[in-house]
C-alpha cells in the first residue's frame, strides 16, 4: 500500500495510463482478474479509466409521499461507473453509500460534500470508494436520503422514508422500480449497465441505513459494511429510559433537511416529536426503527466495524445486532478498534482498503480469495496493535456471574464469585463521571459503590456484552443508575475522549485510487493520538430505575421500596492484564453520558441481589485462576466454581457455538490483511 505522496502520485499516473491500454486488450474475464485458472489473480485490478467514467444522476421513485404534495417522492442517486464494461457488453456490481450528509455536513475526516458541474452531473464524490473501486470494475452510487440535498420527501430519522430511499434504489438496480433522468421529468432511466449485485457501506447514519435496508430482506443486496452504526434508534437516544442526549430525533432531522424539505415537512416533524417523547418510554416510533427485531430477514453478509470507545453510537448497537445476526446464521466479519466514532480509513488505512477490497471482490464479484476463511474478528488490543480471533466472541467464552461483597470501608468492596450479604449506599452526583469514580475506587466516597478484585495473576479477557442486575432502594421518586466495568492499572490507550476521538490528522497525504481535476483520491494521513491512564473503562450501561418493570414504560418510584433492574452493558473485547485489577462500579448519573434525573436520590444497594454477568473467555474457571491468591476477589473463588461453570469453559458455550453458525471455519494457516 502507498506510504508517501510522491510515490502514490507516480503510481497513480502509471496505473491510469496502463488502464486505458489494458481495457482495450484484456478480455472481460481477465479485466476483472477472474480466477479461471490457478495462475489468475484473485482480486479485481484497476484496468478501467476513472477519467472517462460515466457520471450521471437519476431520480428513483420511492413509491411514498412523505411531504404530502400529492406526488410520490423521488430520491437522487449520483452514479460513477466505468465506461468500458458497457461497451464490452458486461454488467458491473454496485457499491452504494446512502447518506443524509452529502450536502449539509460532508463525509469523512475532511468533511467532503458532493459537487456538480453546470449540467448537474457529480464532479466530486466524497470518500475514496469511487476513486478506488470504479477502475476495478465497480459502479459507485451515492444516494441522497429523502428530504436531503436533491431528493424529495422528508427526513424521518431511520424510519420508512429513510430506509425506502435506499431500498428503492436497489430495486431500481434490479429492474423492480422506476427512475427518471430528472427530478420532475418523465424520461425513464434504466439500469442496464449493472447486474444488480449491491453492497452498501457507510459510517454512522449511512451505515445505519445499510442495517435498516438489510433488515427488509431486499433481493440484490449481497453485503453491507456498517461502520459505527445504529441497530436500534431507541438505543441511540435512550438507555432503558435514561436519556443519553438533551435532544431528540426532531433536532437531527431538522439539522440535515434541505431548505426545500424543511418548508414542507412540518407535519412530519410533529410526528417525530410526538413519537419520541423525552420520557424515554418505548413507542411504535421506536419499534419501526428497531432493525434488530428483523435480523431473521437479513440475506446479506455483514462486515461490522465499530470503535469500542464510541460514545456517539454506543457499542450496545453493534453488540445486539451482532448477536441477532449470529442467531440467524448470517455470514459476518468484525473489526473492533480502540477509537471513538472514527472510520477505519483513518486509523488502519492500508489494511482497511486491502480488506474491504477483498471483501467486495468476494461478495460482489464472487472471487474465492479466502477472505471468508480468515479469522472472523480483528481487535485493536493497544494503539496500532491488532490481534485476531477465529470466531467472535471466541470459543469458550461464557457468561460468568460476578458478585459484589462488602469490603473494609464503605463503598470499597470486593468482586468475586460467591454471593454475599450486606448493603452499600451512594448519592447521585451529576457533576462526576465514570473516570472520576475510577480514580477514587480505593477511597470511600459518597457518589459510588465500587467492587474490586485483587491484582490478577494472569490475563483475563472480556469479549461480548455484559449485564448488571442491581437491587436498589431510592429515597426519591426518580433515579438513574450507571454500571461500569473498569480495568484498574496503568496503560497507554487511544485518547477517545479527545475531540478527534483517538486520531491526529497529519499534513501528508496518500492516494487511494485514481483522481481527476475535480475529485482527488489523496487524503490526509492520520496517526494514533494516545494518552497515559491509570484506569480504563471498558464497558458501560445506564438505566432509569423507573423502568424496572422491563415493559418500556417508566413509572414513579416509591421512596423506601426496593426495585430490581438489569442494566445492559455495552459490547467490548478487552484483556485485563496480569497485575491489573477488575472493578465493577455502581453509581448514579454518569456525567456527560446520561442526563440526570429530576431529583438527587440516595440509593441503597442490596448486595445479595446484585450481580454482573460478564462474558469471560474461559468462563468462571478463568476468573478463579486469574484471581487465585490475590486479595479480595480470590476469597473463596475457586470453591465457588460449579461443575457447569467448568464445563462451559472446557467446551464451546452454546451461545458461542451459535455465534459461529453461517461462517466458514478457517484453515490452519490464514492470510492476514496487509498492515
Please report, for each region that a protein language model flagged, where it lies by residue.
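Accessory cap/linker subdomain of secreted extracellular hydrolases
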Residues: 45, 64, 70-73, 106-107, ...
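A fold-wide structural signal in alpha/beta-hydrolase
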Residues: 94, 134-141, 333
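Catalytic histidine neighborhood in serine/cysteine hydrolases
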Residues: 325-342
Amino acid at each position: 500500500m502507498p506510504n508517501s505522496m510522491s510515490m502514490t502520485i507516480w503510481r497513480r499516473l502509471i496505473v491510469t495510463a496502463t488502464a486505458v491500454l489494458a481495457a482495450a486488450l484484456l478480455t472481460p474475464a481477465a479485466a476483472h482478474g477472474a480466477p479461471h485458472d490457478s495462475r489468475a489473480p484473485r482480486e479485481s485490478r484497476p484496468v478501467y479509466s476513472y477519467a472517462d467514467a460515466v457520471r450521471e444522476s437519476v431520480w428513483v421513485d420511492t413509491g411514498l409521499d412523505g411531504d404530502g404534495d400529492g406526488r410520490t417522492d423521488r430520491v437522487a442517486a449520483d452514479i460513477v461507473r466505468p465506461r468500458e464494461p458497457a461497451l464490452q457488453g458486461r454488467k458491473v456490481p454496485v457499491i452504494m453509500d446512502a447518506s443524509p450528509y452529502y450536502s449539509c455536513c460532508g463525509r469523512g475526516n475532511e468533511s467532503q460534500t458532493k459537487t456538480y458541474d453546470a449540467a448537474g452531473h457529480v464532479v466530486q464524490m466524497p470518500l475514496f470508494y469511487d476513486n478506488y473501486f470504479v477502475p476495478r470494475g465497480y459502479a459507485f452510487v451515492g444516494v441522497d436520503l429523502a428530504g436531503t440535498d436533491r431528493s424529495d420527501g422528508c427526513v424521518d430519522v431511520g424510519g420508512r422514508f429513510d430506509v425506502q430511499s435506499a431500498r428503492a434504489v436497489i430495486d431500481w438496480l434490479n429492474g423492480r422500480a422506476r427512475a427518471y433522468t430528472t427530478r420532475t421529468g418523465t424520461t425513464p432511466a434504466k439500469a442496464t449497465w449493472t447486474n444488480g449485485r449491491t453492497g452498501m457501506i457507510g459510517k454512522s447514519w449511512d451505515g445505519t441505513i445499510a442495517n435498516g435496508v438489510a433488515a427488509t430482506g431486499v433481493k440484490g443486496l449481497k453485503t453491507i459494511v456498517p461502520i459505527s452504526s445504529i441497530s436500534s434508534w431507541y438505543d441511540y437516544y435512550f438507555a432503558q429510559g435514561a436519556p443519553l442526549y438533551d435532544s431528540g430525533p426532531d433536532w437531527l432531522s431538522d439539522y440535515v433537511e434541505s431548505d426545500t424539505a424543511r418548508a414542507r415537512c412540518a407535519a412530519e416533524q410533529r410526528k417525530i416529536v410526538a413519537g419520541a417523547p423525552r420520557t424515554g418510554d418505548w413507542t411504535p416510533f421506536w419499534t419501526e426503527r428497531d432493525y434488530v427485531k428483523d435480523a431473521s430477514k437479513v440475506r446479506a453478509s455483514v462486515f461490522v466495524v465499530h470503535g469500542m470507545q464510541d460514545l456517539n453510537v454506543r457499542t450496545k448497537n453493534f453488540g445486539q445486532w451482532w448477536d441477532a445476526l449470529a442467531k440467524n446464521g448470517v455470514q459476518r466479519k468484525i473489526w473492533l478498534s480502540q477509537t471513538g466514532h472514527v472510520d477505519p480509513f483513518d486509523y488502519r488505512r492500508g489494511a482497511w482498503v486491502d480488506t474491504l477490497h477483498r471483501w467486495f471482490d468476494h461478495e460482489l464479484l464472487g472471487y474465492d480469495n479466502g477472505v471468508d476463511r480468515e479469522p472472523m474478528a480483528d481487535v485493536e488490543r493497544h494503539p496500532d496493535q491488532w490481534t485476531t480471533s477465529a470466531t467472535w466472541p471466541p470459543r469458550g467464552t461464557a457468561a460468568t456471574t460476578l458478585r459484589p461483597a462488602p469490603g473494609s470501608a464503605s463503598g470499597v468492596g470486593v468482586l468475586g464469585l460467591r454471593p454475599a450479604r450486606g448493603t452499600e449506599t451512594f448519592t447521585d452526583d451529576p457533576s462526576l463521571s465514570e473516570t472520576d469514580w475510577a480514580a477514587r475506587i480505593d477511597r470511600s466516597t459518597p457518589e459510588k459503590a465500587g467492587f474490586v478484585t485483587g491484582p490478577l495473576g494472569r490475563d483475563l479477557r472480556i469479549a461480548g456484552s455484559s449485564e448488571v442486575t442491581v437491587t436498589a432502594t431510592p429515597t426519591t421518586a426518580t433515579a438513574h443508575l450507571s454500571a461500569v466495568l473498569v480495568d484498574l492499572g496503568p496503560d497507554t490507550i487511544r485518547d477517545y475522549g479527545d475531540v478527534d476521538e483517538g486520531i491526529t490528522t497529519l499534513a501528508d497525504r496518500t492516494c487511494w485510487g485514481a483522481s481527476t481535476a475535480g475529485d482527488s483520491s489523496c487524503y490526509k494521513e492520520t496517526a494514533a493520538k494516545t494518552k497515559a491512564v491509570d484506569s480504563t473503562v471498558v464497558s458501560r450501561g445506564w438505566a432509569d430505575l423507573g423502568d424496572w418493570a422491563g415493559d418500556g414504560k417508566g413509572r414513579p418510584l416509591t421512596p423506601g421500596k426496593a426495585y430490581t433492574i438489569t442494566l445492559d452493558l455495552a459490547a467490548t473485547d478487552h484483556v485485563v492484564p496480569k497485575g491489573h485489577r477488575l472493578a465493577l462500579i455502581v453509581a448514579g448519573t454518569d456525567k456527560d453520558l446520561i442526563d440526570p434525573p429530576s431529583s438527587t436520590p440516595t440509593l441503597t444497594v442490596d448486595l445479595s441481589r446484585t450481580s454482573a454477568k460478564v462474558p469471560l473467555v474461559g468462563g468462571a474457571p478463568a476468573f478463579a485462576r486469574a484471581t487465585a491468591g490475590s486479595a479480595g476477589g480470590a476469597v473463596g473463588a475457586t470453591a465457588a466454581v460449579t461443575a457447569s461453570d467448568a464445563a462451559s469453559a472446557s467446551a464451546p458455550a452454546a451461545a458461542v457455538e451459535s455465534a459461529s453458525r453461517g461462517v466458514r471455519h478457517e484453515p490452519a494457516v490464514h492470510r492476514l490483511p496487509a498492515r
